[in-house]
Amino acid sequence: MQNGKVKWFNNEKGFGFIEVEGGDDVFVHFTAIEGDGYKSLEEGQEVSFEIVEGNRGPQASNVVKL
């Protein structure tokens, strides 16, 4: 697992990006967010996640809010 901070997240479109210190930003889709109910992230929120190879490159998986 890796830690990062939410750079931005668009609730209407259901995706955004996570900043990783010393690395490239990682795409995140709402389906990758762990937990029940409405799945959303807030700008600046700390998260833990795994990186997997998606159709268009690296993306976050198993995203957990810290």
UniProtKB/Swiss-Prot annotation:
Keywords: Activator, Cytoplasm, DNA-binding, Stress response, Transcription, Transcription regulation. One of its GO terms (cellular component) is cytoplasm. Induction: In response to low temperature. Disruption phenotype: A double cshB-cspD mutant grows slowly at 15 degrees Celsius. One of its GO terms (biological process) is regulation of gene expression. InterPro entries: Cold_shock_CspA, Cold_shock_domain, CSD, CSD_CS, CSP_DNA-bd, NA-bd_OB-fold. This is Cold shock protein CspD. It is found in: Cytoplasm. It comes from the Bacteria. Gene3D superfamilies: 6.20.370.130, Nucleic acid-binding proteins. The gene is cspD. SMART domains: CSP. Its main location: cytoplasm. SUPFAM superfamilies: Nucleic acid-binding proteins (SSF50249). One of its GO terms (molecular function) is DNA binding. Residues 4-63 form the CSD domain.
